[in-house]
Amino acid sequence: MIHFLATLCGVLFVYAVVSIVDYFFNNKHKENQEDMMTIIHQQWYKERRALIVDNAHLGMVQVAVPDPDLDDNRIQGKADALIYSLWVDEHFRGYGVGRKLLKRAEWEAKLMGCKTVCLEWDCRETPEWVLRWYKCMEYDAKRTDDFTWLLTKDL
């Protein structure tokens, strides 16, 4: 009986996961995708930020844009905005959650007047497949030291 209940719980969990992914990220629901993210804008000291969270709480990303009034308002002299803290629940990777969050972060940067965005990848903190994924997302990668790459993209 216990084995049956454990199997049933596992099946129900998988069904729930597939249902969530299907509802939120399947192309059948494109008209709802704009409403499936919460964007919180904040003014910080010397920069504006946007926090983007998908409403199913499967992932999030942040964007920082230095104030245009600063003398040096470009990030590492390369970009108008920094995208950071892109995170997707490991159980939902491969379903397009990260791509949608990254695209929305780029869109938010564009709405804030940015023409280029950048992010950093560090091999000590992040698997190499993430660097390859950013390159597939049309980011140009340049090594900055033994461990770090700067990735940039024109919007």
Predicted feature descriptions by range:
Residues D140, T144-L155:
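Active-site/acyl-donor-binding loops of N-acyltransferases
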Residues N27-Y84, D89, T144-D145:
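Acetyl-CoA-dependent GNAT
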Residues V88, G94-W107, C136:
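Conserved acetyl-CoA-binding loop-helix of GNAT-fold acetyltransferases
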Residues L111, C123-T144:
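Conserved active-site alpha-helix within GNAT-family acetyltransferase domains
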Residues Y15-H29:
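Cytosolic-side junction of a single-pass transmembrane alpha-helix
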Residues I83-L86, V117-W121:
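Conserved hydrophobic beta-strand within the GNAT/NAT acetyltransferase core sheet
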Residues M1-G10:
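Feature marks short, highly hydrophobic, charge-poor N-terminal signal-anchor/signal peptide-like helices
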